[in-house]
Structure formats: structure tokens, C-alpha cells
From Swiss-Prot:
Domain of life of the source: Bacteria
Protein's name according to its UniProt entry: Bacterial ferritin
Keywords from the named record: Ion transport, Iron, Iron storage, Iron transport, Metal-binding, Oxidoreductase, Transport
EC number from the UniProt entry: 1.16.3.1
Domain Ferritin-like diiron as annotated: residue spans: 1-145
A matching Pfam family: Ferritin
Residues reported to bind Fe cation 2: 51, 93, 127, 130
Natural source organism: Neisseria meningitidis serogroup A / serotype 4A (strain DSM 15465 / Z2491)
Enzyme class: oxidoreductase
GO terms under biological process: intracellular iron ion homeostasis; iron ion transport
PANTHER family: BACTERIOFERRITIN
Function: Iron-storage protein, whose ferroxidase center binds Fe(2+), oxidizes it using dioxygen to Fe(3+), and participates in the subsequent Fe(3+) oxide mineral core formation within the central cavity of the BFR protein shell.
Reactions this protein catalyses: 4 Fe(2+) + O2 + 4 H(+) = 4 Fe(3+) + 2 H2O; Fe(2+)(in) = Fe(2+)(out)
Residues spanning the membrane: none
The gene coding this protein: bfrA
Length: 154
């Protein structure tokens, strides 16, 4: 099936973002493991797996539309401590959210409702799961302090 080229090109941009998010979560999860924060490791490892699924969904759709997936990832923003890792991941999720909203609009204009629905599902996951959880963690750090937060993540 030949898809709208603008949609395919934009999905490749989204794929690049998902690959970067996956790799960033991978590195951050391993940092958490190294630092002894088991709960943070487990959560970020789970997020990495979800980002891999998001990337796979885009790859399958790009192929279905007759395109070639571009596997180059966007730049990573690697933190140096728990707070900077959480903030970097939240910024990445905000960027993904904004890109998905733009992609949804493009798909509607191109009348590609299947690609649109894929992006809507990923937007829901980004806003209601990933970004929300990261916002909660940063809010907890503000409320209970870094030391208490770190202790809760062992």
C-alpha cells in the first residue's frame, strides 16, 4: 500500500524520537541499577521496553505504507544524577508529546486515519503514563526531599 509521503517522512521523525527515548531510558535504567535504586531501575527498564514497542509500531506502519524506516536516533540527554535523569526523561516525553500532536494533525489532513490512531494511542501512553509518572517523581522529591525519595527507591 502506498502511503502519503509526508506522513511516512514524519513517522520516520517520530521513529527517531522513539529510538532516542528507548536508548535514553536504557542508559538511565542502568545508571539507577549501578547506584542501587532498584525500583527506579525496574520502572525505567519497563519504559524502555514500551519505547521499543512504540518504535516497532512505527516501523511496521512505515513498511506497510511502502516506506523505508530510518533507524537513526535523535540526540540523547543523559543525566548525571537521579534528578537530572528524571528531568531529562520528562523533557524527552514533552518533546515526543508535541511531535505526536503535530503528526496527528498531519495524518488528519492526509486522511490517514490508521496512522492517526496509532499516534493517538502513543500520545495517550506518553501523557497518561510516561510523563505523568515522571512529573509525580519530581513532585515527590520536592515534597519529601531527595534523601527520603532515594531511600524509597532502594
Amino acid at each position: 500500500m502506498q502511503g502519503n509521503q509526508a506522513v511516512v517522512d514524519y513517522m520516520n521523525e517520530l521513529l527517531s524520537g522513539e529510538l532516542a527515548a528507548r536508548d535514553q531510558y536504557f542508559i538511565h535504567s542502568r545508571l539507577y541499577s549501578e547506584w542501587g535504586y532498584t525500583k527506579l531501575f525496574e520502572r525505567l527498564n519497563h519504559e524502555m521496553e514500551e519505547e521499543t514497542t512504540h518504535a516497532e509500531d512505527f516501523i511496521r506502519r512505515i513498511l506497510m505504507l511502502g516506506g523505508t524506516p530510518k533507524m537513526a536516533r535523535a540526540e540523547l540527554n543523559i543525566g548525571t544524577d537521579v534528578v537530572s535523569c528524571l528531568k531529562a526523561d520528562l523533557q524527552t516525553e514533552y518533546e515526543v508529546r508535541d511531535a505526536l500532536k503535530k503528526g496527528i494533525k498531519l495524518c488528519e489532513e492526509a486522511q490517514d486515519y490508521v496512522s492517526r490512531d496509532l499516534m493517538v494511542a502513543q500520545l495517550k501512553d506518553t501523557e497518561e503514563d510516561h510523563a505523568h509518572w515522571l512529573e509525580q517523581q519530581l513532585r515527590l522529591i520536592e515534597l519529601i526531599g531527595e534523601g527520603n525519595y532515594y531511600q524509597s527507591q532502594l
